[in-house]
Amino acid sequence: GIFSKLAGKKIKNLLISGLKNVGKEVGMDVVRTGIDIAGCKIKGEC
């Protein structure tokens, strides 16, 4: 019915926004790690 359609949409939206947040967190970690590695390569410390 209408309710299950709405609930499905809401759940889907929550999942999508949750995944986006997780993606952002993981992305930031990857970026930070990349910056650390680049920094130590430039300084010749790794």
From Swiss-Prot:
This is Esculentin-1A. Expressed by the skin glands. It comes from the Eukaryota. It is found in: Secreted. One of its GO terms (cellular component) is extracellular region. Belongs to the frog skin active peptide (FSAP) family. Brevinin subfamily. Transmembrane segments: none annotated. Keywords: Amphibian defense peptide, Antibiotic, Antimicrobial, Cytolysis, Disulfide bond, Hemolysis, Secreted. Its main location: secreted. Shows antibacterial activity against representative Gram-negative and Gram-positive bacterial species, and hemolytic activity. One of its GO terms (biological process) is killing of cells of another organism. It comes from Pelophylax lessonae. InterPro entries: Antimicrobial_frog_2. Disulfide bonds join C40-C46.
